[in-house]
Amino acid sequence: MRTIPSMSRRSAAALACLALSAPALAACGHSSTSADAAGTVKAVASTTQICDYITQLASGDASSDLSFDRTGADGKTQHFGADAAKATSHLTLTCLLAPNASAHEHDMTTAQSKALSEADLFFVSGVDLEHFLDSAVDSTGFKGTMVVTSGVAGAADVDDLAAQKKKEEAKPYKVDRGSAKVEVAKWPFPPEEGESEPEFRFDPHVWTSPKNAIVQVTNIGAALEKAAPDQAGVFRSHVDAYVAKLKKLDEWAAGSLNSVPQDKRVLFTSHDAFGYFSKEFGVKFEGAALSDFNAQQDATADKIQQTADKVKSSGAVAIFAENSNNPKSIQKVAEVAGVKAVIGDEALYGDSLGTPGSDGETYIGSILHNVSNLTKAWGGTVTEIPADLAQWSPKASDVK
């Protein structure tokens, strides 16, 4: 984790002003997101990727003036940075989604609901990814600022952004889309069996492209700057440092994948999460080998055979499970098609990051893992990982 330089007491005062009741807030001269009187900014993050972005930006060392506490989906809290009793500024982060879980559905725990009801900032991915957002904010009475890290809340933004913003004026919370925005792509896949319409109008899995991750981090940084304007330069410098790593990650990924002839870059997965990744790196993304996300383990023999025939005709040499899916039917398809099944610890990180200690515990680690395993499975050569990304290098036991 990188160290955040110490915040000034003036910055702490700015954060403290964010904490006050409406009359006191006016006296402070602020009309922005509120926090508690102790100078604590309370944040909630929807996805595992966003939780990691914020963690990478906020984890200072013990000599800093910032105390940072992150509570995971399991309810366990980790402390980073300054001792809470000595810190002049405090940030708490509650992460909703668990590692190795779908990013689309989520049942809020009692503790998570309480955290969201008290939150100043709610960081979300957007593009209609999180189907649970409306129920979460409605049931908790959230009244802070929802920060849409992708810059696009959903399909309604694409249709008529002005009209959507007008509707949001009636909501009890604010919506901040930031200044950066991903270029959303239309959802390319047909409806699942038994459904009349596709699940999405636009692909919500924006983070699979490191370039889009840069957009998300930029908007997160802007929200932090608004929370502590006297420290805008400090937050901006930390965002710049992390973005520099993401750019190196992007360049490294391109170098590794370009070692594979483009006609060999054929990707079948167990979930349709890799559209943006594939577009950026010249991969032919066939989507999920089996379209039924929730019942893949129960695919019929006929369905297995049909899918295997499709895999064989595509020229694919491997099919890849994702960490958030049951790999049982993927294994069956691979066996019938005569190709490699990439599963278990080698599976790709798609909807979510991985558990502590896994390659995909962090966003950068997840991309290093995915690109390394894809490149090796396709017969390419993984380029040397840059020195400042080496701490996130995949384990040697991954795909050979």
Question: What are the functions of these language-model segments?
Answer:
Residues R2-A14, L18, A27-K400:
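Extracytoplasmic metal-acquisition and chelation regions
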